[in-house]
Amino acid sequence: MNLTQALKHGLIAAVLALLTGLSGCAHYNNPRDPLESFNRGVYAFNDGVDTAILKPIAQGYRAVLPQVVRTGVGNFFSNLDDVTVIVNGVLQLKIPQATSDLGRFLINSTIGLLGLFDVATELGLEKHNEDFGQTLGYWGIGSGPYLVLPLFGPSSFRDAIGRFADFYTDVVWQINDMRWRNALYGTRVVNNRSRLLDTEEVLKIAAIDEYSFVRDAYLQRRRSLVDDGRRRDAAAAEEDYVPDEPAASAPAAAPASAPAPQVRP
């Protein structure tokens, strides 16, 4: 079994296990994170893997490649991601936006040399962020409990299902040649991780409890993406509400040098 197949099967197994076997985990007081005991354990595991393997590779990657090259790599993968954005824009009935995103993809794939240069943004075509988790939210499916996925990081029950669906619109995952697929996948993961190196320093200074900080930031961002930055009706807002917790009442996070990165596969 190759790397991408192993990761895909591992994610499926993790989601199924979480959906069927975790109801008995120790509960905390936050209704949006009833699996907090389990999630903190996975968070600590992810952080350990990141500290031992991914972060050093990302640091070396940034040290070797100049900023202009890293920007080009990021643009390349962002352009491929527009395929997922277009599909989910259509599924959310955002036809004008999806048309604009299709224009972005065509322009950057041609004039922008396979996306290495973000020509479309210079021409006024805005970059959007859409995925199947947001599509489910658009059609009224609640986020469900917060979830930390092994290796993949912050998620929710809805977004975990959406992540699996997004595999089928991910251009990298559809490449038949295993060597190219794995090379591109690995490069994307490392490039994404390198972009978090500066952010994590701010997190370590600002957050008393890294786990709670990452969780709340993730949930707030996902609500904003589903809402497209607008307020929803009171019932929907209440469904995704995350009450503030006093820092003193939160259990200490597992010692770590950085939060586990959220990497889009």
Where are these regions (language model features)?
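N-terminal secretory signal peptides that target proteins for export/translocation
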Residues: 1-6
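Membrane interface segments of multi-pass transport proteins and intramembrane proteases
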Residues: 52-69
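A structured, mid-to-C-terminal "fold-capping" secondary-structure block
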Residues: 26, 139-265
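Bacterial N-terminal signal peptides
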Residues: 10-23
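Beta-rich strand-turn-strand
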Residues: 74-76
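Bacterial Sec signal peptide processing site at the extreme N-terminus
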Residues: 20-41, 51-53
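Mid-length scaffold segments of soluble, non-membrane domains
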Residues: 79, 86-157
